[in-house]
Amino acid sequence: MNHMKRNFEHVKRIVIKIGTSSLVLPSGKIDLNKIDQLAFVISNLMNRELDVILVSSGAMGFGLDILKMDKRPAEVARQQAVSSVGQVAMMSLYSQIFSHYQTNVSQILLTRDVVEFPESLENVTNTFETLLSMRIVPIVNENDAISVDEMDHTTKFGDNDRLSALVANITNSDLLIMLSDIDGLFDKNPTIYDNAVLRENVTEITEEILKSAGGAGSKFGTGGMMSKIKSAQIIFDCDRQMILMNGANPRDILRALDGKMIGTLFAKE
């Protein structure tokens, strides 16, 4: 392993992305303890005068829980309806728990056309800057209720892994921390191979890495390892850094920022 020292003293603005699999228990119930830990960590970072943006999946998972559905509906309209119910519940819970730490949050729902159209991009960028200047944590998700994925009018990002990388770029963030249900990027699938080795540092996306990144997302989410690798490429392309790490204990974010070798660091040499 390459034990390259990690130093994040330059980091002033962070995007944290949490996936559905980190927010929803295997039973389908919401992991309230996880959300509380995440709120504590983000509030702690805000108190250190860092800017923090949270990209949160979970609207579908919350919606399935509230509506007592055991699986994602097949029809797109029903998927969007369930997500719209879940988004309200998710933001309500975030607002309630962050308030325990005297931290205010806001909601920003994005579609791809907003980011690709210069005037709306400028508006949303100004909104991010204003919220952060007011010491408010923007909580970002794709606007699932209205996003479409058709050839003549594509408004979907694909998944929130890609969305988080784009948000890191448009907000000039120094670091993207991607929380997942795995410890980082391995040389092969750790759920199949016991001898899989964690890659502590990745300086470029190689063909070997692309080959080892197959597989789909969880039953509650959409993002598999390939989507994380593609997001890392966006991060490389805009000269930023990314940590892919396990979201089981959000307090590990603080340890990672202190330089501990947690997860996989994607950073150019």
Curated annotation (Swiss-Prot):
The keyword Nucleotide-binding applies. It is found in: Cytoplasm. Keywords: Amino-acid biosynthesis, ATP-binding, Cytoplasm, Kinase, Nucleotide-binding, Proline biosynthesis, Transferase. One of its GO terms (cellular component) is cytosol. It catalyses: L-glutamate + ATP = L-glutamyl 5-phosphate + ADP. The gene is proB. It comes from Streptococcus mutans serotype c (strain ATCC 700610 / UA159). Catalyzes the transfer of a phosphate group to glutamate to form L-glutamate 5-phosphate. Disulfide bonds: none annotated. SUPFAM superfamilies: Carbamate kinase-like. This is Glutamate 5-kinase. The lineage of its organism: Bacteria, Bacillati, Bacillota, Bacilli, Lactobacillales. Its main location: cytoplasm. Pathway: Amino-acid biosynthesis; L-proline biosynthesis; L-glutamate 5-semialdehyde from L-glutamate: step 1/2.
